[in-house]
Regions:
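Small-residue-enriched hydrophobic alpha-helices in membranes
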Residues: 1-71, 81-182
């Protein structure tokens, strides 16, 4: 648990250096209002995940992460071929996910995307069940959420739909969305 405590301290320091979450005054706009801090959060989470690379080698983490990535990609209800290919390339180039053979990652990601495209609610239920399998290992559970945030924020657009999906995944894992500034 010492590693996770260090990560939480780093995140807290990052949040304090940003002056808290309400630094945008009375402006509204959801994720847009905190665009700069979101980018910093994504960068910090990516670094934190990298520091856990040696611990994140289980099949449960791999499968849950691919389910999370598929949910993020399909958060708006559809995944066009260009988006699918873009997310797939981010997955296989992700430092932590390089613990796994790229073909395993592609296969699991595409299976979930296909299910979500065919029947979103059923696919979502199956993906959430896959994610929930990591709930008993807090480091892996948090890493799944962090992976989702990193993938969602990679294009600079962390949409409300993506945030909602990640909040639901937090609930499936028994984690507070506030822990991830959601």
């Amino acid at each position: 648990m010492a590693v996770w405590d260090r990560i939480k301290d780093q995140a807290k320091t990052l949040q304090q250096s940003q002056g808290g979450r309400g630094a945008n005054g009375g402006r509204s706009g959801g994720a847009r209002a905190g665009g700069g801090s979101r980018a910093q959060l994504v960068s910090a989470l990516k670094t934190q995940l990298g520091s856990l690379k040696t611990e994140l080698k289980s099949g449960a983490y791999r499968d849950a992460s691919m389910a999370m990535c598929a949910l993020v990609a399909a958060a708006d209800g559809h995944v066009d071929p260009a988006e699918r290919q873009h997310v797939e390339s981010m997955i296989v180039s992700n430092d932590v996910l390089q613990n796994f053979p790229p073909e395993q990652l592609r296969q699991r990601f595409n299976k979930h995307v296909d299910q979500l495209t065919h029947n979103f609610q059923l696919g979502k239920t199956e993906a959430m069940q896959e994610i929930a399998k990591t709930a008993k290992k807090p480091t892996e559970a948090r890493a799944v959420i962090q992976t989702g945030i990193v993938i969602a924020g990679a294009d600079g657009d962390f949409s409300q739909a993506e945030q909602m999906i990640i909040r639901e995944a937090c609930a499936a894992l028994g984690l507070s969305p506030a822990e991830f500034q959601l």
